[in-house]
Every structure is written in structure tokens, then in C-alpha cells.
């Protein structure tokens, strides 16, 4: 079996997420808050016979939450420190049907049509391009299976570059937030019947957000300064910051998209009619 080709920004991903692993599910962050995980579980409607892939899983918060509801779970991630953290949590919870596997979404180490459900959460904004990861997620999903993507939605068009610039200041592994239309186009091109495309606002503390990535003090001040400037009537950042009790907060716009795969060939998009 040939060695998986590494994504172009893999060193930045390893560096960022090795640092984040220990605090990735911190109560100060909302990324793994139980109400959001429960919302995802309700949306997926998994069956006890399902084989599930949690791709770019991080610590496997989604996979671990879904583990009691399905036959088996694979949590795939590029960063070993994240997998170690997730594996320890799964063992502590007594989850016996879950595996943690190191690998890349761009080259998933499983055969075609291996899973009934494929989910990836907060990953696409780290991918240099969308097509290859989507094609691989599509390839390993069975016909009739569910492909669930949860990610941050891009700001309005004239603010996208500015928002991504600030995101990259905070986390150099960030590439760009994608729009609802960009995701919808992929689902359509690969022949999915889209069942859900829903928006949720996630409240985020600016300090906790920067603490997670261990953002250097100089950059923290720059980012906070940009947020403060917007609050004072200056240039918009795309974050729509607000002050609560002396602390800066903003909302992340999360999209949840769920599509059911059609019966076309595993690795190929559907041909456009006509």
C-alpha cells in the first residue's frame, strides 16, 4: 500500500493541533459542548447497524458521542496528539467499538463504500482546497449513506478576506472559511439529496479562542485591537464582536449539512444532465 500523500499545510496543522490537544474540549470553549453534540446526534439519526467515520476527528468528540448508537466508529485525524487525547477519553468512558486512526482526509485509508455515515466537523476551513477531501469522503461512503459536514460559514463576500486574515493570525493552519453556496455546489455535483442545511450561532469568548491556540501576546493584542476598533465604529472584521461584562465575544456561524448519497460510482461526481 503506497504511503499517503501529506496535505500541503500539514506541518502547520500538526503544530497547531498538537498544542491544542490538551485543552481542545475545555469547558471554556463551546466546540464540544454537549448541547451541540446532542443537536448533531439528533440530525444524524444513526442506527445500531451503522459503521461511522469521524473524519478529521480531532479528539473524536463526535465519534465518541455517537459510539453508543452505532455498530462501530473510526476516528481519523492527522495529528497523533489529538488521537491520543481522544483514545484516553474513550477508554475512560468504556467505549469498546471505537478506533483512533492516524491519516489524512485527502487520502482516507479505507476501501470504497466502507461506511454508512461519514461526518467531519470544523475541518474544511483547514483544507487547501475542497474537492479532494469531499471526493474522499464521498468515496468511502456507501450508496444511500449520510455525509454530514459541520463547519464555519464564511462571512459576507466583502468581509471574507478580512475574516480569514484574522483567523490565520490566530491559527496559521486556517486556510479559509467556505460559503453555504460552495458546500451546496459540492453536494449537488456528487449527486446527493440534501436533507439538512442549517445554521447555528456559536458564542465564543475571544480570550478563550486565542488561549486554545496559544496565540502569542503581540498577535493577541493586534486581534483584540481590530475587534475594539470595530466596536468603536471602525472597519468591520467579519466577526461582529460584542462586549459582555468587560470581555470580548463573537459568534461563529456554524453550518450543518447532511446529504444522502445517490447510487453513482463511489469516487466520481454525477454528470450534469444535458
What are these regions (language model features)?
Residues 131-143:
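A short glycine-rich, Lys/Arg-flanked "PGG" loop and its adjoining helix->strand segment in the class I
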Residues 176-191:
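Short alpha-helix
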Residues 195-274:
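Conserved Class I S-adenosyl-L-methionine
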Residues 106-117:
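A short acidic, Gly/Pro-enriched loop at the edge of an enzyme's catalytic core
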Residues 53-107:
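Class I SAM-dependent methyltransferase SAM/SAH-binding core
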Residues 1-47, 61-65, 82-85, 93, 148-174, ...:
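Conserved class I S-adenosyl-L-methionine
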Amino acid at each position: 500500500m503506497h504511503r499517503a500523500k501529506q496535505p500541503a499545510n500539514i506541518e502547520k496543522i500538526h503544530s497547531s493541533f498538537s498544542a491544542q490537544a490538551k485543552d481542545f474540549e475545555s469547558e471554556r470553549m463551546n466546540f464540544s459542548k454537549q448541547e451541540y453534540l446532542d443537536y448533531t446526534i439528533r440530525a444524524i439519526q444513526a442506527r445500531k447497524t451503522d459503521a461511522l467515520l469521524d473524519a478529521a476527528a480531532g479528539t473524536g468528540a463526535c465519534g465518541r458521542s455517537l459510539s453508543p448508537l452505532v455498530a462501530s466508529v473510526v476516528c481519523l485525524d492527522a495529528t497523533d496528539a489529538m488521537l491520543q487525547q481522544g483514545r484516553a477519553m474513550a477508554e475512560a468512558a468504556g467505549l469498546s467499538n471505537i478506533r483512533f486512526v492516524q491519516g489524512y482526509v485527502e487520502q482516507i485509508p479505507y476501501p470504497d463504500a466502507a461506511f454508512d455515515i461519514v461526518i467531519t466537523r470544523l475541518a474544511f476551513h483547514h483544507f487547501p482546497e475542497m474537492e479532494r477531501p469531499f471526493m474522499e469522503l464521498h468515496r468511502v461512503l456507501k450508496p444511500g449513506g449520510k455525509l454530514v459536514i459541520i463547519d464555519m460559514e464564511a462571512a459576507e463576500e466583502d468581509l471574507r478576506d478580512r475574516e480569514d486574515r484574522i483567523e490565520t493570525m490566530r491559527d496559521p493552519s486556517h486556510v479559509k472559511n467556505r460559503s453555504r453556496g460552495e458546500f451546496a455546489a459540492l453536494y449537488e455535483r456528487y449527486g446527493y439529496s440534501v436533507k439538512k442545511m442549517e445554521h447555528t450561532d456559536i458564542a465564543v469568548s475571544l480570550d478563550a479562542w486565542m488561549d486554545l491556540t496559544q496565540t502569542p501576546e503581540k498577535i493577541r493584542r493586534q486581534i483584540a485591537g481590530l475587534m475594539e476598533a470595530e466596536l468603536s465604529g471602525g472597519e468591520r472584521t467579519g466577526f461582529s464582536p460584542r462586549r459582555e461584562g468587560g470581555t470580548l465575544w463573537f459568534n461563529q456561524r456554524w453550518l450543518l449539512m447532511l446529504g444522502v448519497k445517490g447510487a453513482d460510482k463511489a469516487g466520481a461526481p454525477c454528470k450534469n444532465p444535458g
